[in-house]
């Protein structure tokens, strides 16, 4: 089974109430090879919500207590991001997920890039909280940007 970010599956769960539908993800869902999950909703957030970014590091730093996740209003929402990451990990284990495709740049789901914590659109290399936790547990995580190259293998 493959787990995919709910926003990539066309669900309007992003912080601003939109989606980021990826056609390849839709194909995986339609063929019942994938299940959609949103770590932020699993962590207790609603839609819409304030955008949030990691301050002082990356997702692994958040898990190890060296960085935090803060929303644009200045609220520390670290605990909710960690809770959502653990809920996503539980789902990955219960589904025996072999691959997880998450939304790049997100403080939860980024796999190569995250926003830099300045709320101005700047990005830095790094991974989000959920991606870091899944990888620490040996689960492969890729972004939607890497999916096209993997689709033939996944659909075969």
Identify what each model region corresponds to:
Residues 12-15, 23, 42, 60-87, ...:
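Divalent-metal-activated hydrolytic enzyme cores
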Residues 99-114, 118:
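Internal, conserved structured core segments that host functional sites
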Residues 12, 46, 108-111:
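Short catalytic/ligand-binding loop motif for oxyanion handling, primarily in non-cytosolic enzymes
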Residues 1-3:
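Extreme N-terminal starter segment of soluble prokaryotic enzymes
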Residues 7, 103-106, 146:
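Short, well-ordered beta-to-alpha junction loops that form the rim of enzyme active sites
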Residues 20-70:
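Short, surface-exposed acidic-centric catalytic microdomains
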Residues 93-96:
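Glycine-rich phosphate-binding loop signature in dinucleotide/nucleotide-binding domains
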């Amino acid at each position: 089974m493959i787990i995919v970010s709910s926003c990539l599956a066309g669900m309007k769960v992003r912080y601003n109430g939109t989606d980021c539908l990826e056609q390849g993800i839709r194909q995986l869902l339609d063929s019942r090879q994938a299940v959609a999950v949103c770590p932020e909703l699993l962590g207790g957030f609603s839609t819409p919500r304030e955008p949030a970014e990691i301050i002082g590091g990356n997702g692994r730093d958040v898990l190890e207590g060296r960085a935090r996740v803060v929303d644009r209003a200045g609220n520390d929402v670290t605990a909710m991001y960690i809770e959502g990451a653990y809920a996503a990990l539980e789902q990955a284990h219960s589904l025996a997920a072999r691959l997880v495709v998450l939304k790049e740049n997100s403080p939860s789901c980024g796999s190569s890039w995250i926003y830099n914590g300045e709320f101005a659109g700047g990005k830095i290399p790094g991974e989000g909280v959920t991606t870091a936790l899944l990888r620490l547990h040996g689960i492969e995580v890729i972004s939607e940007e890497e999916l096209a190259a993997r689709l033939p293998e996944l659909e075969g």
